[in-house]
UniProtKB/Swiss-Prot annotation:
Keywords: Metal-binding, Nickel, Zinc. Transmembrane segments: none annotated. PROSITE patterns: HYPA. This is Hydrogenase maturation factor HypA. PANTHER family: HYDROGENASE MATURATION FACTOR HYPA (PTHR34535:SF3). The keyword Ribonucleoprotein does not apply. One of its GO terms (molecular function) is nickel cation binding. Zn(2+) binds at residues 70, 73, 86, 89. The lineage of its organism: Bacteria, Pseudomonadati, Thermodesulfobacteriota, Desulfuromonadia, Geobacterales. InterPro entries: Hydgase_Ni_incorp_HypA/HybF_CS, HypA/HybF. Belongs to the HypA/HybF family.
Length: 110
């Protein structure tokens, strides 16, 4: 489960940003195309924050839906996989414009 190491990295990023202050809440953005399972991150969060500035912090996850832009006709549409064709023209030259995110969106500290 790579979500454990991802969650450990998120906690490290939060601690650096908190500059020694206690972390009360963390909001993450996780894209549907990122390959990260939000439920697994939630499961790992408590274990990864034990003994850190984020121990006891609340975790909220904002899921970012996948969106693609057709390279042929410029239509922007929802995508669930990297191989979705354009619904307008059927082309497969789609550029992902949203849904790959994995970032700390907000951090609440004391």
């Amino acid at each position: 489960m790579h979500e454990m190491s991802i969650t450990q990295n998120v906690v490290e990023i939060c601690e650096k940003s908190a500059e020694g202050r206690r972390i009360l809440a963390v909001v993450l953005e996780i894209g549907e195309l990122s390959g990260v399972v939000p439920e697994a991150v939630e499961f790992c969060f408590e274990a990864c924050t034990a003994g850190t500035l984020a121990e006891g912090a609340r975790l909220a996850i904002d899921r970012v839906p996948g969106r693609g832009e057709c390279g042929n006709c410029a239509t922007v549409f929802p995508v669930r996989t990297y191989f979705d064709p354009c619904p307008a023209c059927g082309a497969y030259g789609v550029r992902v414009v949203a849904g790959e995110e994995l970032r700390v969106k907000e951090l609440e500290v004391e």
